[in-house]
Design a protein with these regions (language model features):
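Short basic helix-loop element that most often maps to the first helix and adjoining turn
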Residues: 4-23
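Conserved hydrophobic/aromatic packing and binding residues within compact polymer-binding modules
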Residues: 6, 20-21, 31-34, 60
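Recognition helix of helix-turn-helix/homeodomain-like DNA-binding domains
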Residues: 25-40
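DNA major-groove recognition helix of helix-turn-helix
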Residues: 35, 45, 61-64
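DNA major-groove recognition helix of helix-turn-helix/homeodomain DNA-binding modules
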Residues: 44-59
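Short, charged recognition helix plus adjacent turn
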Residues: 63-90, 132-134
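Short beta-strand-centered segments at strand-helix junctions
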Residues: 93-104
Length: 138
């Protein structure tokens, strides 16, 4: 997973091996070894790679685009998430995945606001978070 994620993220950002290697302070040959799986970076180099590629370290190392719920998508940018697919129930209800509820601090009884854009789709945001954003704009 790591080597595949590293290659796809490097290419997505348009970096050559030499350019990315320079950003993290290693030789092009060392980066090439990371990409072939011949060697693995230490934790500090992983942190530098994740920062340069604008992804979380966890996603850089562990993200599996073929895993259930990732829909075959590449590693999402840092702070962005793929939570998988949820079905709409008979009465229009959806279940928000546990990981999404944890990340966004959503609990039973919270008020959520649904926003829609006919060309983009539907978004969900906690009521208090939207109100805070609106207050800051005043």
């Amino acid at each position: 997973m790591f080597k595949d994620n590293l290659i796809s993220m490097r290419k997505m950002h348009g970096y050559s091996q030499a350019e990315l290697a320079e950003k993290i302070g290693v030789s092009r040959q060392t980066l090439s070894k990371y990409e072939t799986g011949e060697s693995l970076p230490d934790i500090e180099k992983c942190r530098l790679l994740a920062n340069a590629l604008e992804v979380s370290m966890d996603d850089l190392v562990n993200y599996d685009k073929e895993a259930n719920g990732n829909l075959g998508l590449e590693v999402p940018p840092k702070g962005k998430h793929v939570f998988g697919i949820t079905k709409v129930g008979d009465k229009g209800q959806i279940v928000i995945p546990a990981k999404a509820r944890k990340i966004f601090d959503i609990h039973p009884g919270d008020n959520l606001i649904l926003l829609g854009d006919e060309s983009q789709g539907i978004a969900v945001i906690k009521e208090d978070r939207l109100l805070d954003m609106l207050k800051r704009q005043e």
